Amino acid sequence: MDTYGSIKRDLKYMYDVEEVFRNTIPKTYFGIDDVEDLHVDEAGISNIHNNITLGTKKCYHLYKKGHRTQVPIYLGSLVTRESNEYEDVSYSYDNLNTIYKDAPVWEPLLNKVSKWYDEGWSVPSSKPIPYDPNYSKCLILSPDKYKKYHKVVVDVDYDAFHWSIDVNSEFMDMPNVIRAWDISTIPQFVDGFPMLKHLIDRSKKEALFYFNYRLIPYVVHNIDKDDDMWREWLSYFLHGDHFKPDRGSYDNFGSLLGHKRLEVALMYHNRIRLMPMSATALDAMNEGAKFLMKDPTYHTAVMKKYNGVLTQYGMAEPLGYNRGWGYTGVTTADSPFILSNVNGADGYTVIDREAVEEAKEIGMQYTPKLVKLQLANMTKTSSPVNLIDSLIGNAIISLTGFAGSEKVSTALDQFEKENFERKVPDELFTAISNVTYEMVRESFQPLERSMLDKRTRLLRLYNAGTSASSSAPPGARYIFNKKMIMYSTFLSKSIDVTDEYAPMSFITSLNFNNKTANILTHPQNYYMYDWHDNHNRIINSGSREVRGGRATRIITPDPPSNYMLLILGALNTVRDMGSHRTGFSNLGMNEVVGSSFLDAVSHDALAPQCLATSSSRSLCAQALDYSTWDRQQGGRIAEAKAHGIMRVANELFPNTNTNLSDVHNLLELPMSSILYLWSESIKSSYKYKIDHSTVAVDAVRSGELTTQFSNHVTNLAALRQYHETYNRTKVPQGFRPIEVAQINIVGDDVNVILRTADRKPFTLRDMEGYHNHTFEKAAEYEFSISKKRSMMSNVATEHIKQYFKMGDILLDVMLSSMTSERNTFREQGYMNGINLLYDIAVTIMARYAQNDKLFEDMMANLPFMEGVVYRHGSQKYHFHPSPCHLLGSGSPEILPSAIDLRTFARVITVLGDYESDLYEAMSSLNATLLSTSGTTQFESQVRKHLSEELGDNIISPVWSEVFYRDEVGYEMVTKHNKLTPEGHREYLVDRIISTLSNREKLIMNNADIIEKLLSGKLKKVKRYFQEIKFKMSNMPITGLPDRKIEGVSELSSPYRAADVGMRRVHKCIGLSRRNLKFPSVTERLSRLLKSYGLVTQADSAKILSAAAGLGRSSTRYRNLGTDLGLSDMHASSFAQRLPALLTQYEIENASGSFTFYDTVSRTYDVSEASMNERVGDVSNNPIARANSSTSTYYRFRGMLHCLYGARFGLSLHASVE
């Protein structure tokens, strides 16, 4: 294959995309017809007024000449316009006039529709949904009645309380889910209660719709009057159900959920563009979208009642088997999969027929096409289309995006205690205690891990500031109200400055209510442990939304000092849970794999699930689904965990008397006392503020450090009991002995691989006997476990939204790049947004979408991004970078035909001078777009305000006990005072300031970016490596050979529904096992400084930045080392090691050379062995140096060429010409 010919075609395609983009941008800003090319080389900041007509609607295409060829290179388009001013517009159609009066932002769409009407087009009106009077009967309006009704409510703010919802009311189904009721049918008041206002407020809070693009232009340019789904939406919108959008907030004039109906239409079109589904599935998707559009959030909740059961049984009892993975390889440390190319033997699934029948009966009333598809899919065999079809129900319920539920009622449902005292038999109590003991005791091996002096404890707290596992206390925060922040702009720097274009300013409130800031200013809030205060304090709760109609999740963080307690007593345990390496010998060792894996990908970490659902019939998988697991962890179960912790304390540490009524200094408390306080905190309840209520939570708290550990312990203990009692009680009754081969537990999610003791195939009777015993035992323990959502099978299984069907892996399909949970996407800056969209794209690629479709979708959506936005008075400036900026460093650096190969695009520089100019121009553009000069301005002014109001008192003096120099009277040699122990206070002030909101920083950064663009002063980027040409030759495939199904060859990758190019790489090169790692230079420096025993407040990136400015001088490097606090011996070693680190630092800053692995590429075999096999000696390249990072770099670039060829089905070898 001529890879370079393909690369040239990719580049030609990018030029075509760029041309379409350049023509599209002005059309997305309605009324802008004036377009002009502007060559920024010739502009200069002093001539901006002469080059830009301020205050007019115009689009400037910006160009800059390449320094080699002097050919102008398109940078992007700058749109200038005034803020929206709407004039009176009159239409010949009353409905359009009504919409314009309420929401004039829709004028471009209304103009379009008016022309359609003129041409004879029409759309019928959809029937609105009237208000249900029974809703008022579901409201609790008396705070006293409300408090009495809910046992977990310990207090009510009588002034704030106006209403609550009875979730289990007999009068109405799911009253806590907001409905799409016609606003005109909702009474203003019901018995004095302001019903209309109440429901409108609910819709704004609960029915979220944060679109990642500019909504109106996106709709106008993508709408099709003849498309069935667009017509469905227009049947609502044009007949009264319109709304006014305003950056995530919506004023509805028809129904309460007009905006969610539009979201369904947008998400539907995105799904059908990207998902290669069957015609039957497309019909089901169309049917489901129309059903959801009628009443988006409620109908999503209705679909959840039947979709889950029918989805999990997809391909559960197929009529044929065509997959077989070899047992060899999965039980060793070798390649995870050996394809047998044999038909799988018959397998079985324990199916809850009653649950299937119930789901069928419900679903046939609403989405019969979907239900028929799902029922038919149960007997189908695995294929790419069938796999995707099996998850169409999930894809449908995700069309409503983030649709939560009423917060207080959700919280009460989440935390409400059962009406009985849970029975915890001694055998379960002992099992929970044993698991807790094992995990905690192991975390203190060797015992030195528990030896924490005061300095080490404070250092743990310092490094824990970025975690979200605790709340900041309500007091001890600095709030500076109404501080003036000035920022100069390209306007104010122009020659003739009038008042209209004077320097800008804004008034902002600076709120330091942030955990990092609080730790640095008031660490005593964390290390002074007051049991009485913790349990009487009212803690603010949080919340998050989840796709697919699931209820709002309430987050309950720890009190600050309890957080500190856990990072001292439990941090090792939590870390150990998350640091298991996958091992295929698990199948022989009965090893329990913890909550997560190092470097894990599905085919590696969960290979036994693939094996158990394909050819090895002596294995099967059992997946259990617990309901409200968190709230089942209180009472005697919590006591069992506390008992296990105290067994460790009593065994390993001297006994101490710890009084709960005392206030304890955690910096000095012995480990036995810390474990005692941890054990007591597990058994106790905490109070959380949720709107108008204070709720007591005595179960596992969702925002604490040990949430997953605590859920894991009970899950594992119960699982052991299910298994042990089965073999003890059921085997004597004639059932076969069963062994546990592997357990995967993540909190309340469990998937266990079971094996017959005699290694003979499972029968259906074996599975049913074991599965039924599990539920009998769970009922005995009074665990709430859903039988209809649990399954036992050696054909299909599921673990944490990863589906395994006949050995194939299918990942969840709910992810989308169209909407976000919060408005943060638009507030994070353009380049961060681009990188996030890219990450989502490659994740979807590994699940169901094809490369070409994904790239086309990204390019089609690019003109509708916000771009770099800057406002000055009534004027707005929008800069939209060229699509070619995705080729340059600082972006993913991708080519259209291989978006999974991050950084590969720099290969274009070997094609010629123009291509080199293009790469450098796009890299400079990206560096400019990533500029943080505005942030620097902002933070320097904030620092001045802090100094004026607080002087030197902002940082707690306790940090001087952590960051100090042993040597007395040391005199600094370099100028980098903030990095030294003596300068730690200044450094920590900077760290506090960095926690402030991004909004002000973004405003100032954008002003600076547009100034640099218009002046032609883009940031220069050094290319550390020059790309070289490789000679490509054919070699035998080393990956998974094709399998034959009914005589037809087919790719055999386990990711069978994923992008075909990805699967070809698995064939030609192979699946990943232990890929080559490229540790970042900051990671390497951190390890080096730690080996020297240095305790410093400075992060490695800032140290490297300081060193880079010293010039290549070993004396200066040694001086920097001593300034940091190193001994003379270590400073000399530091000076010797630093040049190599600085080389890598320059490489990473210049080109991000070693940033490669993403969701897709992580599955490719890029191991040392694979590279040795596929890439020849690069040392004969004059640019490379043996045994250096340059050699590694060029070997990796050669491997990228091999991966690129493999995407097209070619197994290649790369050598240097």
Swiss-Prot record:
It comes from the Viruses. One of its GO terms (cellular component) is virion component. It is found in: Virion. It is an enzyme of class 2 (transferase). GO terms for molecular function: hydrolase activity; nucleotide binding; RNA-directed RNA polymerase activity. Keywords: Hydrolase, Nucleotide-binding, Nucleotidyltransferase, RNA-directed RNA polymerase, Transferase, Viral RNA replication, Virion. NCBIfam families: seadorna_RNAP. This is RNA-directed RNA polymerase.
